[in-house]
Amino acid sequence: MKRPSGRAPHQLRPIRITRNYTRHAEGSVLVEFGDTRVICTVSAEAGVPRFLKGQGKGWLTAEYGMLPRATGERMAREASRGRQGGRTLEIQRLIGRSLRAALDMSKLGENTLYVDCDVIQADGGTRTASITGAMVALVDALAVLKKRGALKGDPLKQMVAAVSVGIYQGEPILDLDYPEDSDAETDLNVVMTDAGGFIEVQGTAEGEPFQPEELNAMLALATQGIRELFELQRAVLAD
């Protein structure tokens, strides 16, 4: 089996995370997984949703979108259609769930963090790139809030990262780009903590059902890839 990109089955795409990419947000990055590029910002506002008022806890929510020409053909903006699509809603909920798992909300105070992930170029794996990049922006945003004296303690419990895996031409592969994702027999999105726990495993068989041994092989491959992503996050944050 030869991957269209020429990568080995266990090989990630070239990945880069550029911090402080925009001027105004408390945390911001440009994350690049090969030709997939996403701007992730984290903005902090005082106050929480009504269901949390008076509890002394914070909240984090996420939004996700794609530029009209992030893909091969121009897409109409969802705002011009008057509603968000099901895929968009699913992805932004996934991003929010994943990043909330990184935090102790009781130490965030009554603050809300808004995570915005905007895909400027898509070549597969936009949701996993968004989670991995937004995690770095989140750490930077928390540092800003700490300097402002807005936190009750350190809300960061653990780091979070995500990657895609799949079965392509009968073999498990890591970090699918668009051509691979389009032709994969199975694709899986995996979100993990740096303690080794799973936050989310989303899997779909496009043709034949995948077998337990294939699932285990994909999870092992994802775990290895996410370990590499944690190393990259730590290196970027240490810079």
Curated annotation (Swiss-Prot):
InterPro entries: ExoRNase_PH_dom1 (IPR001247), ExoRNase_PH_dom2 (IPR015847), ExoRNase_PH_dom2_sf (IPR036345), PNPase/RNase_PH_dom_sf (IPR027408), Ribosomal_Su5_D2-typ_SF (IPR020568), RNase_PH (IPR050080), RNase_PH_bac-type (IPR002381), RNase_PH_CS (IPR018336)
Pfam family, one: RNase_PH
Keyword ATP-binding: no
EC numbers, comma separated: 2.7.7.56
Binding-site positions, phosphate: 87, 125-127
Reactions accelerated catalytically: tRNA(n+1) + phosphate = tRNA(n) + a ribonucleoside 5'-diphosphate
Keywords: Nucleotidyltransferase, RNA-binding, rRNA processing, Transferase, tRNA processing, tRNA-binding
Record-linked CDD domains: RNase_PH_bact
Functional note: Phosphorolytic 3'-5' exoribonuclease that plays an important role in tRNA 3'-end maturation. Removes nucleotide residues following the 3'-CCA terminus of tRNAs; can also add nucleotides to the ends of RNA molecules by using nucleoside diphosphates as substrates, but this may not be physiologically important. Probably plays a role in initiation of 16S rRNA degradation (leading to ribosome degradation) during starvation.
Listed NCBIfam families: RNasePH
Family affiliation: Belongs to the RNase PH family.
Protein's recorded name: Ribonuclease PH
